[in-house]
Design a protein with these regions (language model features):
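Active-site-adjacent betaalpha module
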Residues: 1-23, 36-44, 69-77, 88-89, ...
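Short hydrophobic beta-strand that contains or immediately precedes a catalytic carboxylate
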Residues: 25-27
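A short acidic, glycine-rich active-site loop
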Residues: 48-65, 104-113
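Domain-level signal for Mg2+-assisted phosphodiester chemistry and nucleotide/NA-binding surfaces
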Residues: 59-61, 71, 75, 81
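Catalytic-core segment of enzymes that process non-peptidic bonds
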Residues: 83-87, 91
């Protein structure tokens, strides 16, 4: 739903893509919540509700090759490829915030060491940075902001899951901290199409976060490489 407040002012220009300032970040594409055999799937199975995650896993399957394509392209262009995951330091997750603290029922679902692992299709290569979080936003419980500034990153391109949860909160936090933010809408996913589409609409309503398809993102990356900045595009930051 559109907020008419944004009609008062001109829409912000889309961000410039500059070499050396880009980072692709993939949120929570790990066994715990992105694989049917992960902790979330096991928890659903324990109460006979595996079917509620069917659309989620179908969306993940569609997004994975797109994320990999984007990762390979960013690597080829010498831009940063980053990863964020949920990873507790304790068996029961007691160090997490209340929103992430497992309920008594969830605590009974045994955790597997694979749950922390990022899916092999989009796994880190070499010494790519992995940020382990115990919160929805990667900015809340990691040092990612300091690292991004140290790396010279000013523009974050988001992929991963879920669009209406950890992706949205991380993207909004990034925008609040002065980073340019692009969301790859067909390389992010939610448990339902409706939740995904609603989150995209909310995030992009004011123009401070821009949504692009995988194809459009790859074209912008190529354009940046050829011309350093894409022709005819304004700068939002």
């Amino acid at each position: 739903m559109h907020d008419p407040f944004y009609d008062i002012f001109p829409r912000p220009p889309e961000p410039v893509w500059r070499t050396g300032e880009m980072a692709l970040i993939t949120i929570d594409m790990q066994y715990m919540d992105a694989h049917p055999d992960g902790w979330m799937g096991r928890a659903a199975g324990a109460v006979g509700k595996r079917d509620v995650l069917t659309q989620r896993y179908e969306a993940i399957a569609r997004a994975l090759p797109r994320i990999r394509q984007l990762q390979d392209a960013f690597r080829a262009h010498g831009e940063q490829v980053l990863h964020a995951r949920i990873a507790f330091r304790t068996d029961d997750g007691r160090e997490a915030g209340r929103a992430f603290m497992p309920s008594p029922h969830e605590q009974s679902i045994a955790r597997d060491e694979r749950d922390d692992e990022i899916l092999s299709e989009v796994a880190p290569v070499g010494d790519e940075l992995v940020f382990s979080k115990t919160s929805s936003s990667v900015f809340s419980t990691t040092d990612i902001e300091r690292v991004l500034w140290n790396l010279g990153v000013r523009h974050l391109v988001f992929t991963g899951l879920v669009t209406d949860g950890c992706v949205e909160l991380s993207a909004r936090d990034a925008a609040d901290r002065g980073f340019r933010v692009t969301l790859v809408e067909d390389a992010t996913c939610s448990s339902t199409p409706e939740a995904h589409e609603d989150a995209i609409a909310r995030m992009t309503d004011g123009g401070f976060i821009v949504a692009k398809s995988t194809e459009e993102t790859l074209e912008l990356l190529e354009s940046m490489s050829r011309a350093l900045t894409p022709a005819g595009v304004g700068d939002a930051a």
